[in-house]
Structures are given as C-alpha cells and as structure tokens.
A protein has these predicted regions:
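Solvent-exposed amphipathic alpha-helical surface segments
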Residues: 19, 23, 90-98
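Terminal substrate-recognition subdomain of acyl/acetyltransferases
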Residues: 57-58, 96-155
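A conserved beta-strand-loop-helix scaffold within acyl/acetyltransferase catalytic domains
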Residues: 1-3, 12-68
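Conserved acetyl-CoA-binding loop-helix of GNAT-fold acetyltransferases
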Residues: 70, 76-93
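Hydrophobic, well-ordered secondary-structure scaffolds
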Residues: 64, 86-90, 104-110
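Short, flexible loop/turn elements at secondary-structure junctions
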Residues: 41, 69-72, 110-112
Length: 155
C-alpha cells in the first residue's frame, strides 16, 4: 500500500489536537510538514515523530531536532525508543545523500518526565537510546542531548 502523506498529516494534526500538545500560536500545518515517521494500529495513528534541521550553536554543528509523541494508551511499550532509532536511521541516510546540508547527527530536548531517571546519566547507552549524550540545557532547564552520525565530520 502506498504511503498517503496527506492522510498521515491530517491524522497527526488530529492526534496533536486531541492531546492538546501544540503551542497555541503554532499552525498545526507547519508542524505536519516536519513529520518524519508515523505508526498506526488498526487504522488509528498511535504515534509520530517530527524532525527540524537547525544549528546547535554550542557545538557549531547542524542537527535534526527530534520530537516524538505516542498516544497515551500506547505508552510504556518501548515505542518512543523505536521511533527514535528509526527516525535517527532515516535522518542519517538522508544526511549521507545530502552532504551539502551538513547535518551531523540527531538532537533532542528532553521534555518527558518518564525519562527523569535516565536524565541522571550523561550518556544514554541503554538499548534503543542511541547513545544520546548530554551537551547542555535550554533556558528553561531542559536537557539537550545529541547522537552524532558515524559519518559526521566537523569543519
């Protein structure tokens, strides 16, 4: 079956709206253009990841910033780790095909309280955690973590 991007985007907007997770001033259509991966169960969208390319100034490098949302009834099943690993793989492959974009890895800003125990570890080495390394904090005190690609080279 062919991928239906318009359906995935509409389903993602519906999921974000149902869960009330988008900032009030953000057009959901903008976030939908950032979709990276989606998962369905019995025809219902149960999770999405998004990716935004941006510089991480303290590392002087460009990363894909990863976000993930899993529907509450499907959480605590390892889906977020699966989304993370899969999204990282997609981004790494894309980065190799587009070296002019100079995307050197995947970054994430930790927002989930479910990761509080992991957040005490500077490097996340557990299976599926992609070796995410703590590199700093946002102004709101949230952890910034990165996973460098094997092909990454600094200028």
């Amino acid at each position: 079956m062919a991928r239906d991007d318009a359906k995935v985007a509409a389903d993602a907007v519906a999921l974000w709206t149902r869960l009330g997770v988008l900032p009030p001033d953000l057009d959901p259509g903008i976030r939908a253009k950032e979709l990276c991966a989606a998962a369905y169960h019995d025809g219902e969208l149960i999770g999405v990841s998004t990716m935004v390319l941006d510089m991480l100034p303290q590392l002087k490098a460009r990363f894909g910033f990863f976000r993930c949302l899993i529907a509450p009834e499907y959480r605590q099943q390892g889906l977020a780790r699966t989304f993370g690993a899969y999204s990282r793989q997609l981004l790494a492959e894309w980065s190799k095909r587009h070296p002019q974009e100079k995307v050197l890895g995947m970054a994430t800003i930790v927002e989930s309280s479910a990761l509080d125990e992991f957040s005490k570890q500077p490097v996340w080495e557990a299976p599926g955690m992609m070796g995410l390394v703590l590199v700093g904090y946002t102004q709101k005190g949230r952890q910034i973590r990165v996973s460098w690609f094997e092909h990454a080279r600094l200028d």
